[in-house]
Protein backbone atom coordinates (compact mmCIF):
# COMPACT_ATOMS: atom_id res chain seq x y z
CA UNK A 1 0.00 0.00 0.00
CA UNK A 2 1.02 3.61 -0.58
CA UNK A 3 2.89 4.86 2.53
CA UNK A 4 1.54 5.89 5.90
CA UNK A 5 1.62 9.63 5.17
CA UNK A 6 -1.06 11.51 3.24
CA UNK A 7 0.36 14.54 1.45
CA UNK A 8 -2.37 17.12 1.96
CA UNK A 9 -1.42 20.62 0.92
CA UNK A 10 0.45 22.31 3.76
CA UNK A 11 0.45 19.10 5.82
CA UNK A 12 1.83 15.59 5.82
CA UNK A 13 -0.86 13.71 7.69
CA UNK A 14 0.45 10.60 9.41
CA UNK A 15 -1.83 7.60 9.01
CA UNK A 16 -0.14 5.32 11.52
CA UNK A 17 -3.21 6.00 13.68
CA UNK A 18 -6.74 6.68 12.40
CA UNK A 19 -7.62 10.29 11.70
CA UNK A 20 -10.97 12.02 12.20
CA UNK A 21 -12.42 14.27 9.53
CA UNK A 22 -15.08 16.54 11.04
CA UNK A 23 -18.02 17.52 8.84
CA UNK A 24 -19.07 21.15 8.37
CA UNK A 25 -22.21 21.15 6.21
CA UNK A 26 -23.14 24.54 4.75
CA UNK A 27 -26.17 23.15 2.93
CA UNK A 28 -29.71 24.25 3.85
CA UNK A 29 -31.12 20.82 2.95
CA UNK A 30 -28.74 18.59 4.92
CA UNK A 31 -30.54 15.54 6.33
CA UNK A 32 -28.05 15.12 9.15
CA UNK A 33 -28.25 18.56 10.75
CA UNK A 34 -31.23 20.23 9.11
CA UNK A 35 -29.14 23.04 7.68
CA UNK A 36 -28.20 24.29 11.14
CA UNK A 37 -24.89 25.75 9.97
CA UNK A 38 -25.98 27.21 6.65
CA UNK A 39 -27.61 30.41 7.89
CA UNK A 40 -24.52 32.48 8.60
CA UNK A 41 -20.76 32.10 8.57
CA UNK A 42 -20.29 32.74 12.28
CA UNK A 43 -22.51 29.79 13.22
CA UNK A 44 -20.56 27.54 10.87
CA UNK A 45 -17.21 28.80 12.16
CA UNK A 46 -18.25 28.21 15.77
CA UNK A 47 -19.22 24.65 14.80
CA UNK A 48 -15.88 24.10 13.04
CA UNK A 49 -13.98 25.39 16.06
CA UNK A 50 -15.95 23.05 18.32
CA UNK A 51 -15.12 20.06 16.10
CA UNK A 52 -11.41 20.83 16.41
CA UNK A 53 -11.67 21.07 20.19
CA UNK A 54 -13.48 17.74 20.24
CA UNK A 55 -10.67 16.00 18.38
CA UNK A 56 -11.08 16.50 14.63
CA UNK A 57 -7.81 16.22 12.71
CA UNK A 58 -9.26 17.60 9.47
CA UNK A 59 -12.19 19.92 8.70
CA UNK A 60 -14.31 18.94 5.69
CA UNK A 61 -16.41 21.84 4.41
CA UNK A 62 -19.14 21.38 1.81
CA UNK A 63 -21.79 23.53 0.15
CA UNK A 64 -23.75 20.97 -1.87
CA UNK A 65 -25.89 18.21 -0.44
CA UNK A 66 -25.18 14.92 -2.19
CA UNK A 67 -27.77 12.94 -0.22
CA UNK A 68 -29.97 10.55 -2.22
CA UNK A 69 -32.47 12.51 -4.30
CA UNK A 70 -30.73 15.85 -3.78
CA UNK A 71 -31.34 18.52 -6.40
CA UNK A 72 -28.45 19.89 -8.41
CA UNK A 73 -26.75 23.00 -6.99
CA UNK A 74 -24.96 25.31 -9.39
CA UNK A 75 -21.25 25.93 -8.81
CA UNK A 76 -22.04 29.61 -8.30
CA UNK A 77 -24.50 28.89 -5.49
CA UNK A 78 -22.17 26.33 -3.94
CA UNK A 79 -19.28 28.80 -3.93
CA UNK A 80 -21.45 31.51 -2.38
CA UNK A 81 -22.19 29.13 0.50
CA UNK A 82 -18.60 28.15 1.26
CA UNK A 83 -16.41 31.12 0.32
CA UNK A 84 -16.45 33.11 3.57
CA UNK A 85 -16.04 30.05 5.78
CA UNK A 86 -13.15 28.70 3.71
CA UNK A 87 -11.45 32.09 3.76
CA UNK A 88 -11.54 32.10 7.56
CA UNK A 89 -10.57 28.50 8.37
CA UNK A 90 -7.74 28.60 5.83
CA UNK A 91 -5.86 30.73 8.35
CA UNK A 92 -6.40 28.46 11.34
CA UNK A 93 -3.35 26.30 10.70
CA UNK A 94 -5.29 23.02 10.44
CA UNK A 95 -5.88 20.70 7.47
CA UNK A 96 -8.87 21.96 5.48
CA UNK A 97 -10.79 19.79 3.03
CA UNK A 98 -13.32 21.03 0.48
CA UNK A 99 -16.14 18.62 -0.35
CA UNK A 100 -17.04 19.42 -3.96
CA UNK A 101 -17.46 17.76 -7.35
CA UNK A 102 -17.34 20.97 -9.40
CA UNK A 103 -14.13 22.10 -11.09
CA UNK A 104 -15.13 25.77 -10.88
CA UNK A 105 -15.51 25.55 -7.10
CA UNK A 106 -12.23 23.67 -6.73
CA UNK A 107 -10.41 26.30 -8.79
CA UNK A 108 -11.77 29.22 -6.77
CA UNK A 109 -10.97 27.53 -3.47
CA UNK A 110 -7.43 26.65 -4.47
CA UNK A 111 -6.86 30.23 -5.67
CA UNK A 112 -8.05 31.42 -2.26
CA UNK A 113 -5.23 29.46 -0.61
CA UNK A 114 -5.11 27.36 2.53
CA UNK A 115 -7.23 24.52 1.09
CA UNK A 116 -5.33 21.29 1.59
CA UNK A 117 -7.66 18.56 0.30
CA UNK A 118 -10.26 18.15 -2.43
CA UNK A 119 -12.82 15.54 -1.36
CA UNK A 120 -14.73 14.66 -4.52
CA UNK A 121 -17.73 12.31 -4.63
CA UNK A 122 -17.35 12.23 -8.42
CA UNK A 123 -13.66 11.22 -8.33
CA UNK A 124 -12.46 14.15 -10.47
CA UNK A 125 -14.70 13.28 -13.43
CA UNK A 126 -16.04 16.83 -13.86
CA UNK A 127 -14.51 18.44 -16.94
CA UNK A 128 -11.12 19.90 -16.11
CA UNK A 129 -10.98 18.63 -12.53
CA UNK A 130 -8.21 16.11 -13.07
CA UNK A 131 -6.10 18.60 -15.00
CA UNK A 132 -6.62 21.26 -12.33
CA UNK A 133 -5.44 18.97 -9.53
CA UNK A 134 -2.52 17.74 -11.61
CA UNK A 135 -1.27 21.34 -11.71
CA UNK A 136 -1.23 21.52 -7.91
CA UNK A 137 1.98 20.39 -6.27
CA UNK A 138 0.71 19.01 -2.98
CA UNK A 139 -3.10 19.18 -2.67
CA UNK A 140 -4.53 15.99 -1.19
CA UNK A 141 -7.28 14.19 -3.07
CA UNK A 142 -10.03 11.81 -2.03
CA UNK A 143 -11.60 9.89 -4.91
CA UNK A 144 -15.01 8.39 -4.18
CA UNK A 145 -17.07 5.71 -5.93
CA UNK A 146 -20.66 6.56 -6.83
CA UNK A 147 -23.03 4.62 -9.08
CA UNK A 148 -25.18 7.21 -10.84
CA UNK A 149 -25.76 10.74 -9.56
CA UNK A 150 -27.15 11.94 -6.21
CA UNK A 151 -30.56 12.52 -7.82
CA UNK A 152 -30.93 8.91 -8.97
CA UNK A 153 -28.17 6.84 -7.33
CA UNK A 154 -30.45 5.00 -4.91
CA UNK A 155 -32.94 3.94 -7.56
CA UNK A 156 -32.29 0.20 -7.83
CA UNK A 157 -28.46 0.09 -7.68
CA UNK A 158 -27.06 -3.19 -9.02
CA UNK A 159 -23.69 -4.96 -8.97
CA UNK A 160 -22.43 -8.39 -9.92
CA UNK A 161 -19.57 -8.05 -7.42
CA UNK A 162 -19.77 -4.85 -5.40
CA UNK A 163 -16.32 -5.16 -3.82
CA UNK A 164 -14.59 -5.99 -7.08
CA UNK A 165 -16.42 -3.35 -9.09
CA UNK A 166 -15.78 -0.59 -6.56
CA UNK A 167 -12.12 -1.60 -6.28
CA UNK A 168 -11.62 -1.64 -10.05
CA UNK A 169 -13.26 1.76 -10.49
CA UNK A 170 -11.23 3.42 -7.75
CA UNK A 171 -8.01 1.78 -8.89
CA UNK A 172 -8.64 3.02 -12.44
CA UNK A 173 -9.37 6.57 -11.27
CA UNK A 174 -6.21 6.58 -9.17
CA UNK A 175 -4.23 5.32 -12.17
CA UNK A 176 -5.57 8.20 -14.26
CA UNK A 177 -4.43 10.61 -11.58
CA UNK A 178 -0.95 9.09 -11.58
CA UNK A 179 -0.81 9.26 -15.38
CA UNK A 180 -1.70 12.95 -15.19
CA UNK A 181 1.24 13.57 -12.87
CA UNK A 182 -0.39 13.41 -9.45
CA UNK A 183 1.88 11.80 -6.85
CA UNK A 184 0.41 8.64 -5.27
CA UNK A 185 0.96 9.91 -1.72
CA UNK A 186 -1.63 12.63 -2.42
CA UNK A 187 -4.41 10.09 -3.02
CA UNK A 188 -6.93 8.45 -0.71
CA UNK A 189 -9.97 6.45 -1.76
CA UNK A 190 -13.57 6.30 -0.52
CA UNK A 191 -15.80 3.33 -1.46
CA UNK A 192 -18.87 5.57 -1.26
CA UNK A 193 -21.16 4.02 1.29
CA UNK A 194 -24.81 4.77 0.43
CA UNK A 195 -23.84 6.33 -2.90
CA UNK A 196 -25.60 3.97 -5.27
CA UNK A 197 -25.61 1.00 -2.89
CA UNK A 198 -28.27 -1.02 -1.10
CA UNK A 199 -27.93 -1.91 2.56
CA UNK A 200 -26.52 -5.31 1.62
CA UNK A 201 -23.99 -3.70 -0.71
CA UNK A 202 -22.88 -1.44 2.14
CA UNK A 203 -22.58 -4.32 4.59
CA UNK A 204 -20.56 -6.34 2.08
CA UNK A 205 -18.20 -3.43 1.47
CA UNK A 206 -17.70 -2.90 5.20
CA UNK A 207 -16.92 -6.56 5.76
CA UNK A 208 -14.41 -6.58 2.92
CA UNK A 209 -12.53 -3.33 3.50
CA UNK A 210 -9.21 -5.20 3.95
CA UNK A 211 -9.58 -6.76 0.50
CA UNK A 212 -10.59 -3.41 -1.00
CA UNK A 213 -7.53 -1.73 0.48
CA UNK A 214 -5.25 -4.55 -0.64
CA UNK A 215 -6.65 -4.49 -4.17
CA UNK A 216 -6.42 -0.72 -4.64
CA UNK A 217 -3.21 -0.11 -2.69
CA UNK A 218 -4.32 3.23 -1.23
CA UNK A 219 -5.48 4.43 2.21
CA UNK A 220 -9.24 4.38 2.67
CA UNK A 221 -11.37 7.27 3.87
CA UNK A 222 -14.74 6.05 5.13
CA UNK A 223 -17.92 8.10 5.53
CA UNK A 224 -20.90 6.34 7.08
CA UNK A 225 -21.88 8.93 9.68
CA UNK A 226 -25.66 9.31 10.14
CA UNK A 227 -26.32 7.77 6.73
CA UNK A 228 -29.33 5.71 5.70
CA UNK A 229 -27.49 2.43 6.30
CA UNK A 230 -27.13 3.39 9.98
CA UNK A 231 -30.84 4.12 10.10
CA UNK A 232 -31.66 0.78 8.49
CA UNK A 233 -29.37 -1.12 10.85
CA UNK A 234 -30.67 0.58 14.00
CA UNK A 235 -34.24 1.45 13.07
CA UNK A 236 -33.55 5.13 13.75
CA UNK A 237 -35.40 7.34 11.26
CA UNK A 238 -34.05 10.64 12.59
CA UNK A 239 -30.62 11.18 11.01
CA UNK A 240 -29.51 13.47 13.85
CA UNK A 241 -30.15 10.63 16.34
CA UNK A 242 -27.93 8.08 14.58
CA UNK A 243 -24.79 9.03 16.50
CA UNK A 244 -24.36 5.78 18.45
CA UNK A 245 -24.73 3.61 15.37
CA UNK A 246 -22.39 5.89 13.47
CA UNK A 247 -19.65 5.54 16.08
CA UNK A 248 -20.00 1.76 15.99
CA UNK A 249 -19.70 1.79 12.20
CA UNK A 250 -16.65 4.06 12.35
CA UNK A 251 -14.96 1.65 14.76
CA UNK A 252 -15.83 -1.27 12.49
CA UNK A 253 -14.22 0.57 9.57
CA UNK A 254 -11.07 1.38 11.54
CA UNK A 255 -10.83 -2.21 12.76
CA UNK A 256 -10.82 -3.27 9.10
CA UNK A 257 -8.07 -0.87 8.11
CA UNK A 258 -9.70 2.50 7.37
CA UNK A 259 -7.22 5.34 7.90
CA UNK A 260 -9.64 8.30 8.01
CA UNK A 261 -13.25 8.42 9.20
CA UNK A 262 -15.50 11.30 8.16
CA UNK A 263 -17.96 11.99 10.97
CA UNK A 264 -20.48 14.41 12.45
CA UNK A 265 -20.08 13.20 16.05
CA UNK A 266 -16.42 14.00 16.56
CA UNK A 267 -16.18 13.81 20.34
CA UNK A 268 -17.96 10.47 20.59
CA UNK A 269 -15.77 9.03 17.83
CA UNK A 270 -12.57 10.42 19.33
CA UNK A 271 -13.47 9.07 22.78
CA UNK A 272 -14.27 5.64 21.35
CA UNK A 273 -10.94 5.49 19.52
CA UNK A 274 -9.06 6.59 22.65
CA UNK A 275 -10.77 3.88 24.69
CA UNK A 276 -9.95 1.23 22.10
CA UNK A 277 -6.30 2.23 22.06
CA UNK A 278 -6.10 2.31 25.86
CA UNK A 279 -7.60 -1.17 26.01
CA UNK A 280 -4.85 -2.46 23.75
CA UNK A 281 -6.86 -2.91 20.60
CA UNK A 282 -4.64 -2.54 17.55
CA UNK A 283 -5.84 0.39 15.47
UniProtKB/Swiss-Prot annotation:
The outcome of changing residue 229 to T is: In strain: 418
Question: Which residues are recorded as binding (7,8-dihydropterin-6-yl)methyl diphosphate?
Answer: 66, 99, 119, 190, 227, 262-264
Swiss-Prot/TrEMBL cofactor(s): Mg(2+)
Tell me the impact of changing residue 228 to R.
In strain: 1014
Keyword line: Folate biosynthesis, Magnesium, Metal-binding, Transferase
MF-aspect GO terms: dihydropteroate synthase activity; metal ion binding
Statement: the UniProt record of this protein carries the keyword Magnesium: yes
Per the UniProt entry, the effect of residue 255 to R is:
In strain: 1014
Which pathway is recorded for this entry? Cofactor biosynthesis; tetrahydrofolate biosynthesis; 7,8-dihydrofolate from 2-amino-4-hydroxy-6-hydroxymethyl-7,8-dihydropteridine diphosphate and 4-aminobenzoate: step 1/2
| Domain called Pterin-binding: residue spans | 18-274
Matches recorded under InterPro entries: DHP_synth-like, DHP_synth_dom, Dihydropteroate_synth-like_sf, Pterin-binding_dom
A single GO BP term for this record reads:
folic acid biosynthetic process
Q: What is the effect of changing residue 241 to E?
A: In strain: 418
For the ligand (Mg(2+)), the binding residues are 25
This protein's superkingdom? Bacteria
Q: Which family does it belong to?
A: Belongs to the DHPS family.
Question: What is the name of this protein?
Answer: Dihydropteroate synthase
Q: Which organism is it from?
A: Neisseria meningitidis serogroup A / serotype 4A (strain DSM 15465 / Z2491)
